Amino acid sequence: MHERYVPADVEAAAQGDWRAADAYKTQEDAQKPKFYCVSMLPYPSGKLHMGHVRNYTINDVMYRYLRMNGYNVLMPMGWDAFGMPAENAAMANGVPPAKWTYDNIDYMKGQMQSMGLAIDWSREIATCKPDYYKWNQWLFLKMLEKGIAYKKTGTVNWDPVDQTVLANEQVIDGRGWRSGALVEKREIPMYYLRITQYADELLNDLDGLGWPERVKIMQQNWIGKSFGVNFGFPYELDGEKQLLRVFTTRADTIMGVTFCAIAAEHPLATRLAQGKPELQAFIDECKRGGVAEADMATMEKKGVATGFSVTHPLTGEPVEVWIGNYVLMSYGEGAVMGVPGHDERDFAFAKKYGLPIKQVIAAEGHTYSLDAWQEWYGDKDIAVCINSGKYDGLGYAAAVDAVAADLKAGGFGDKQVTWRLRDWGISRQRYWGTPIPIIHCPSCGDVPVPEKDLPVVLPEDLVPDGSGNPLAKSEAFLNCTCPKCGAAAKRETDTMDTFVDSSWYFSRYTAPDAETMVDARTDYWMPMDQYIGGIEHAILHLLYSRFWTKVMRDLGLVKFGEPAKNLLTQGMVLNETYYREDAAGKKTWYNPADVTVTHDDKGRPVGATLNADGQPVVLGGIEKMSKSKNNGVDPQVLIDQYGADTARLFTMFAAPPEQQLEWSGAGVEGASRFLRRVWSFGYANREALASRAGFDAAALGDADKALRREIYSVLKQADFDYQRLQYNTVVSAAMKMLNAIDGAKGATPGVLREAYGVLLRVLYPVVPHVTYELWKALGYADEFGPLLDAPWPKVDEAALEQAEIELVLQVNGKVRGALKVAKDASREAIEAAALADDAFAKFGEGKPAKKIVVVPGRLVNIVV
């Protein structure tokens, strides 16, 4: 054992042992309870960031603690390897996305291994490998057979210069990110998955999940079950009688309708624009720009009057029709009723264009004004109908019932449940993704690729140039034979949304070598007992993976309907930001490592200068680590300087897993200092610790008893905190233990050895390298086996027993001392001891006690 703690040597030695023993290879074991813990698989972007380090360390701590407690634990890892960033990098570097991706995987895997993570690498998957995405294609074809997958036209962002489809994030201020051309909305054929078929189940099954409440609420809102009325405004056009259908949850305000707005893509808009250049120009404008719902929500609301009116179904009055850029054709009916008196968006629209505003609900104690919107205008819970004829005086529910009944009687509509959730469009006009297994035949139409011909392999040698999909230009990929008629045909060149790849990878981990999509091993491990990932995945990934799991269940592939029993969303890692701003307002951000900060006498930052030139920089505050703010910390630099255990210890100690973590260089140094203390104590006391000296618990002296009592008391709390996933307080407990051991003057070698052995096991899940090596060097491994499989220490309840307890002594409610009494002392004995104590003689001022309050096990208060 070396005198000095050298992290690089310690970690290399421990990892060498683990590799030699294949320590983390896991098999199914019916004799043990299983625990399957999974970190969301990373995108191979090039390097790990501190968010990765935190996520994987949380998982690793969980793995090691549960393995010590007798569980059969599995922690796998893989790579979410398809996606647009690889294409962008390929264009920038002139290399195929495959090379960029595989190089990054190699580097990041090495980083993970240097962290000492308990990953079973025999189960590693990369979603860009044919043996994985074959099953994306296979399940897609099964869904096609069952009608869950289908084809229809969908709206995309089209760059007319690059002749390519753009993702929403590639549209910047309405223009293509590369070409700068005005983006158009275009309708193209796409494949969809019928997730709406599972809407009720997706909503109801949230109740049984051990997921954070805010994640459940986000999914509930995204699924968006709404109870309302679907009805139509009648109109006649070119001799045809039709209904302009809308859906509303506020049928109680129907008498306040003063206009209707329709989407630019609505069939009525197309017909009304014929021969009207100004209408067509506005429709074309609406079709440019992004199609993301978030963009639609924040952009300026614009509209154009069509000059056409529909008829109010209950009053018979004409209602003017407008085309609005805020109306989504993909949501509801592509048309909305405008009630500016009681809808904030409609109110702003009406004020902008001078449309009538009519009040049709009132609330006691509130005054209505047309001048400015007030929140209560849209509050259905306090609303009573006014100016609504026969509905006057009705509250929300009664008014909706009455209006719905009248609309139904007139043949205009009825009550309806609708969903915000839309079917999942999986077609992407991109190269680096799972090929959609469809062949286009001039005679037979769209023909599914036969199962025997799967996978449709994506060529890995193409280099995208930004002008269209490379697959459409690859004759070798494109040209094929129709499996039905044998004629020359073309392959589908769209690839699948990368959320498909991440919707079931956790099931493939359980059977990575299976010749079927999954097998019996999947039902052993799944569902995941713990899933760990960022809150940013709360909706799409987590919702799609739940849907995919239910489809697999319904196809008889698995026996479970939810992918994860429990979810932990770890907090973001934050760091200080520093910048300079030029005359044009452009900010240049500087990494905290390149900045020197000055503090006031209370330790608060008051200024900062750039090390390169000594000139001031602006303190930008604490924000999430990101490339854009240049405030990240490279985990590899941290590991090279301090060791993986220090990085792990700091990330676990600085904050509870679900809370934000503020980066602190001083905190990292403190973590390193603590590990040096643990090592130094072991080295300084190596003879006593390695002595294997035993002891008779009944014959121990006070110093030994006190140390054992403290160690086991803290162990009990640490065990509880491990179970609650509160790893920051586990580290606090270990620090208390070390202080107790270090300060235990007069403790005998046997008790010291026991206490230090408990400390090593408590710390091991958090800092496995240093504890593993100390355990081995000090002879614990010879006695109890390697720390990898050493059992979790059991609390010796007898050691917690005390002959005496200490009570707080108060006089007139103020703490004046402490009182030692027998643990089983009677109330009378406690009162007598309190009155006899020097503190009462000193602070009682010679007065007799009026009353003595005894709180058992805590305090005595003498009132004079």
UniProtKB/Swiss-Prot annotation:
GO terms for molecular function: aminoacyl-tRNA deacylase activity; ATP binding; leucine-tRNA ligase activity. A motif ('KMSKS' region) lies at residues 624-628. This is Leucine--tRNA ligase. It is found in: Cytoplasm. ATP binds at residue 627. Gene3D superfamilies: 2.20.28.290, 3.10.20.590, HUPs, Isoleucyl-tRNA Synthetase, Domain 1, Valyl/Leucyl/Isoleucyl-tRNA synthetase, editing domain. CDD domains: Anticodon_Ia_Leu_BEm, LeuRS_core. GO terms for cellular component: cytosol. Its EC number is 6.1.1.4. NCBIfam families: leuS_bact. PANTHER family: LEUCINE--TRNA LIGASE, MITOCHONDRIAL (PTHR43740:SF2), LEUCYL-TRNA SYNTHETASE (PTHR43740). It is an enzyme of class 6 (ligase). It catalyses: tRNA(Leu) + L-leucine + ATP = L-leucyl-tRNA(Leu) + AMP + diphosphate. Keywords: Aminoacyl-tRNA synthetase, ATP-binding, Cytoplasm, Ligase, Nucleotide-binding, Protein biosynthesis. Belongs to the class-I aminoacyl-tRNA synthetase family. The keyword Transcription does not apply. InterPro entries: aa-tRNA-synth_I_CS (IPR001412), aa-tRNA-synth_Ia (IPR002300), Leu-tRNA-ligase (IPR002302), Leu_tRNA-synth_edit (IPR025709), M/V/L/I-tRNA-synth_anticd-bd (IPR013155), Methionyl/Leucyl_tRNA_Synth (IPR015413), Rossmann-like_a/b/a_fold (IPR014729), tRNAsynth_Ia_anticodon-bd (IPR009080). The keyword Chloroplast does not apply. It comes from the Bacteria. A motif ('HIGH' region) lies at residues 42-52. It comes from Burkholderia multivorans (strain ATCC 17616 / 249). One of its GO terms (biological process) is leucyl-tRNA aminoacylation.
